[in-house]
Amino acid sequence: MEDFLGNIDPKTLEELYQSWKINPHSVDEGWQKFFMGFDFALSDTFGQGSTLSDLEFKVIKLIEAYRLRGHLFTKTNPVRARREYKPTLDIENFGLEQKHLKLKFKAGELIGLSNATLSDIIERLNRIYCSSIGVEYMYLREPKLINWIQERVEPTLNHTEFTAKEKKHILYHLIAAVGFEQFIHKKFIGQKRFSLEGLEALIPALDATIEHGAEQGAREFVIGMAHRGRLNVITNIMQKPFNEIFAEFIGESYDDESTLGDVKYHLGYSNTVETDYGKKVRLHLVPNPSHLETVGPVAEGIARARIDDEHSGDVKSLIPIVIHGDAAVAAQGVVYETIQMSRLKGYSTGGTIHIVLNNQVGFTTNYTDARSSTYSTDVAKVTLSPVFHVNADDPEALLHVIRLAVDFRQTFHRDVFIDLLGYRKYGHNEGDEPRFTQPLLYELISKHPNVRDIYTKYLIESKFISSIEAKQMQEQYNDLLEKHFAKAKENPKIKIKHFLPEKWNAYRYSQSSDFEESPQTGVSADIIENVAKLITDIPEGIPLFKKLIKIIDERKKNYNDGKVDWAMAELLAYGTLIYEGHNVRLSGQDSERGTFSHRHSAYSIQGTEEKYYPLQLIPNAKFSVYNSLLSEYGVLGFEYGYSVALPEGLTIWEAQFGDFHNVAQVIIDQYLSSAEDKWGLQSGLVLLLPHGFEGQGPEHSSARIERFLTLAARNNMQIVNATTPANFFHALRRQLKRDFRTPLVVFTPKSILRHPKNVSLVKELENGSFQEVIDDNKVNESAVSRVVFCSGKIYYDLLQRKEELDVDDIALVRIEQLYPFPKSQVDRVLDRYPNTKKWLWIQEEPKNMGAWNFVKEFFDDVPIEVISREASGSPAVGLSKIHSLEQAEIITKVFRPCTCELKNKYCGLQCEEGSKRFERKKQFEYLDNK
């Protein structure tokens, strides 16, 4: 016999009973109910005298087994028998026999039966735990959560008795769900739509979530889902006009000719709808790519921004809903990252309702090959979230679970999962043949009626509706679709509407001319002074770490001397924006302090776990900084979503090292760089990516500048490699000083954060704007023979050598913004040096990386050459000594004196001897070849 409660024996149970007699509240609520009204000491029914009957205890174990494992024996699969699990719930596995079925047991009190027979107890347990609903919850650890669920599923037999009106309402949504799919299948034969057929019960489920959620205080819902069933949701739930969907099937062009667009089942939508009880709620279906589960963190970020902004932190006002596929939720790592965020202060949205569309197959992969876990939803156990498994052919059971899920979320502000078991009527898409890979399953599916017909039959047989009325409902819905279809044919042009228009209607799309010159972003001296004081004045009575005090004092001294370093300029940018009424949010691994211990936006108070945030003292807006969980993909997706929902705020994600951003490459590729082209969706998100070659090896050197430049087109992002604190200050402020939003990627410094020359004057923050190009102001223009273009940290290496040699005829020109490339400003630089003989692009990255392959196209009027590291598959060497040799060779090539008959001041390898030198043919030799 399986010992389901191996840590509990009759003696322990007796001790619990004795404790309860002394103090009823000394045991949890479940045991209180069991012992209440019992007097086991007087019971000799089974000859046990003053101890609990052994048989009684066995029945208790049976009850606990149903609670713990009943979900394994449910009738939740609509098309085939489920897997068998051992041991079963047969009474023989608990030391009980058939002869005990007619005996009465007081243990029935645990599930609401007084002095019931074992047969009655088992019948009740099967109805509660082994019907169309399976409940996983006994792992939740917190008694209040377990008791809450038991109190709602056991007395009700895990069932809701719906009224005739409610049943018709369910039927209407099933008619809509099934009718929509069948209509499209008939009108647009063979076109991909990723139908919902086999899981149409999702539509009444979402309707119930919104209706019941609104009654429980929700005024807004953010929905993230992939393509399966999306068109059905966007019409029947989001109430996007049918004719607009049909136009997306028919149409051949967009009303805005500059739009690149996306397939119809990726587009987002926002709308205000009215519930059956007259409450207006706001719905948002987040646009998404085909990359499964990426939309999860994006939806959570949007939800958090709306909660912070629109709902003043009230999580009950907004409910996020994330809809998964069974194969994806079980296998995609970003799901784990997102779920781990759910209870963290910087990322919590007060609980998400997760609905898994479980069609038991992933493209062509059987569920037995798609996961090692029992359920696709087993990731829910990570955050101790309950899971309800439901048969998709039982819509009333599903709506019962939906109400439970909404109530649980609104009560405990935690995630809850619904595993909706159905099937996929067709292949992965409508042109796919599933019988190649699942012949037995699709033989069953081909004979299986849809949920609309199943439920209609039940209502007719139960006298809730007549067959004529049911037929009329279907005909009316189909007539509605026909009218919209005719309307779509009249005007088939496709219009992509703004997602979250209430936030974005005030913004326009950018034009190329917007990037020719940056707007003024200076701040008055008084405001800067006030913010600087907050940052550098430590309130009395707050004990801080001595080294931190030294850093703050150094900042104060520099500021009083009229100078700011990189970190101070950054904090001043945030503080001045907050002063002007803009929220600022920064998150990333170690972002409070900064990876390189430079930022210190939060001061840890000695002897406590508390922190002091100077910028949070500015009253006009909110400053939030969070050390993120060790995630790039999930967190960047979250911050992207946050930026989309709060364009008037500054949202920043910082990588620990820029090298690690590629863990989140999907978010960069599918959202950050392309969302405006695909969905008309702007974002002002800032990425801070520490970058620079300093001998730390191939994984701590490169933020992959070249990758971002490859993605750059149509003004879809700004790529900055700033070299001064002031320019960084203006780049950050520029994000909020224009009437459009474009992502900003900043390659931030590491070793030069404390470089004595990497400082700016406070006056540079008070006036001016971001400088896309910084020319050399310490040269004799007419005497310049060599112009060196560079970007980022290598400038300081070049500057050091230039000053050591006291050179005034080599100009060092910094390209501070790589994209949009400042062509007109660069041309003005070229015109400034008429006597130049050599034009160089210098970079510390390998030739096939960095900016060279991008920028060289813009120097079409001059014969520019590159000096860099040799092309390589790996960004950097592993040994510090070799790194130093490489770096020295790059710098040396710029300033090497000429020794040939040409008598140039600097060697350009232009003479006959130079052209034959080994180094000319293999320019990347790190040591001199003489």
Model-derived regions, located:
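Subset of Sec-pathway N-terminal targeting signals
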Residues: 1-38
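Alpha-helix capping and helix-loop boundary segments enriched in small/acidic/polar residues
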Residues: 4-7, 50, 193-200, 282-293, ...
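Active-site pocket-lining segments that scaffold enzyme catalytic pockets across diverse folds
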Residues: 179, 183-243, 553-556, 565-583
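Cofactor-binding active-site loop characterized by glycine-rich and histidine/acidic residues
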Residues: 219-384, 388, 596-649
